């Protein structure tokens, strides 16, 4: 789907979130990596419109950019946020847990089957 540079960037973000969570936990700061599904950005929608047969159905499953904000808002309000810190989360799955919907009222489907499982890191800390 994407090239190695894209994948390396995503993997680096996941590891950075994990490592930052260790450093910031004593200060009460939570850090997570959030995996979004296909985003219905203006650019993405133009691509879909230019080749509707090629991308049939994909727009129906795309998440709005506002959906990301709604999930982040729910996370910020979660009194148990620190228990999620240092982990990778799929936005659609968090949304289902929090009862968050997209701007059109839909509950986006988790892209886990397409993207694979989220990254997990060990608890070892070297000081």
Where are these regions (language model features)?
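Catalytic loop of short-chain dehydrogenase/reductase
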Residues: 1-26, 36-39, 45, 49-51
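Residue-level detector of anion-binding/catalytic polar loops
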Residues: 30
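Flexible loop/turn segments at secondary-structure boundaries
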Residues: 40-41, 97
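C-terminal helical subdomain
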Residues: 33, 55-127
